[in-house]
Regions:
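A cross-family glycoside hydrolase active-site/sugar-binding cleft signature
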Residues: 132, 153-155, 186-190, 233-237, ...
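Glycan-recognition patch characteristic of GH18 chitinases/ENGases
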Residues: 120-216
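Active-site groove signature of glycoside hydrolases
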Residues: 217-246, 296-307
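Intrinsically disordered, low-complexity Ser/Thr-rich linker and spacer segments
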Residues: 56-57, 63-78, 83-84, 104, ...
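N-terminal amphipathic/basic-hydrophobic helices that include classical n-h-c signal peptides
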Residues: 1-20
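Substrate-binding surface in catalytic domains of secreted glycosidases
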Residues: 161-168, 245-249, 253-307
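Soluble non-cytosolic domains of exported or imported proteins
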Residues: 76, 80, 167-168, 207-215, ...
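Primarily a LysM-type cell-wall glycan-binding module
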Residues: 17-39, 63-90, 113
């Protein structure tokens, strides 16, 4: 799978069977050209689909390369557009983008250009890709990534002690998501403060006062409805151990409120190896109770970055 950097982090989950794909392990002396020639595919496709620009003749030994063979292609004619080509061939525009990474999610094509409509080898199971992105993400990175997205979380909305929402300037990146029609936007609600750290003082204050929960839910839902968010992603980190049992109750309340509007709720949790794992990141989290309270759980694995 071609790697992308959203300026934050990507979550990828799915099931692929290798027998439906060609995975080539580079041997000493092999190049992109020799490998592509062996399999009868375009070297340009091999480079683009594996992010190998600049490495064509100096591939590291042992590198695994995905070989994709087009089963149907299309040659661009004068006055063709990407949307017209997709419609003519019975695929979505995003499928055209995904099959042709060289487009970078853009519509710039030229007569004589060969585009891939279908590949021989494809995953037999569905997949989903979700990601968090800062609002200052480079437009080019956003455009080339969005056609692959099924979940998208602009990072991040906050709140204060009165349960008022700290706004996020997400209009531009949301407009790009809706332009591609590629996925669902989830409202990311966290306890991240202006100094870049998660505040367990703020989370404890909120969790201790249930009267604030309805205010927070009202404010969150109002913005979700105004901006077209499909769900809520709650991300309270470094919770105090004393909040371990009240947090799932709060999650259950928020889930009920957003479910009433036809939306889903995700909770992001740190990876734990045991229920009693010590550490500030883990002691306030109860997998079982949170799992029962939320629609979905996102188990994160980036604690090595924030510890």
């Amino acid at each position: 799978m071609h790697p992308f950097n959203l300026g934050a982090y990507i979550i990828v989950y799915g099931v692929f069977l290798e027998k439906y794909m060609i995975i080539h392990t580079v041997k000493n002396g092999e190049t992109v050209y020799s490998i592509s020639n062996y399999y009868g595919v375009s070297s340009e496709l091999t480079v683009i689909n594996n992010g190998l620009s600049g490495l064509e003749e100096k591939l590291p030994e042992g590198l695994s390369i995905v070989i994709l063979r087009p089963s149907k292609t299309y040659t661009v004619s004068q006055n063709d557009t990407t949307r017209a080509i997709a419609f003519k061939n019975g695929i979505t525009l995003n499928t055209l983008y995904r099959n042709n990474l060289i487009l970078n999610g853009n519509d710039l094509i030229f007569p004589g250009q060969t585009l891939v409509i279908e590949y021989d080898e494809a995953p037999i199971f569905d997949y989903a890709i979700g990601g968090y992105a800062y609002t200052n993400i480079a437009e080019a990175v956003l455009n080339e990534t969005l056609p692959f997205m099924k979940l998208f979380m602009p990072f991040t909305y906050g709140f204060n002690e009165n349960a008022e929402i700290i706004e996020l300037n997400d209009d531009i990146i949301l407009s790009r998501l809706f332009h591609y029609g590629a996925g669902e936007a989830f409202f990311h609600l966290s306890t991240l403060t202006e100094n870049g750290s998660f505040s367990n003082t703020l989370s404890s204050y909120l969790l201790a006062d249930e009267s604030l929960w309805s205010i927070l839910a009202d404010n969150v839902i109002k913005i979700m409805e105004e901006k077209g968010y499909s769900g809520l992603d709650i991300d309270f980190e470094f919770l105090n151990s004393s909040d371990r049992y009240i947090y799932p109750i709060f999650i259950s309340y928020m889930r009920e409120r957003v479910n009433q509007t036809g939306r889903k709720l995700i909770v992001a949790v740190p990876p734990k190896t045991s229920s009693d794992q010590p550490g500030q990141l883990y002691e306030g989290i109860d997998y079982k109770l949170i799992g029962e309270a939320a629609d979905y759980i996102l188990v994160m694995s980036y604690e090595c970055v924030i510890l």
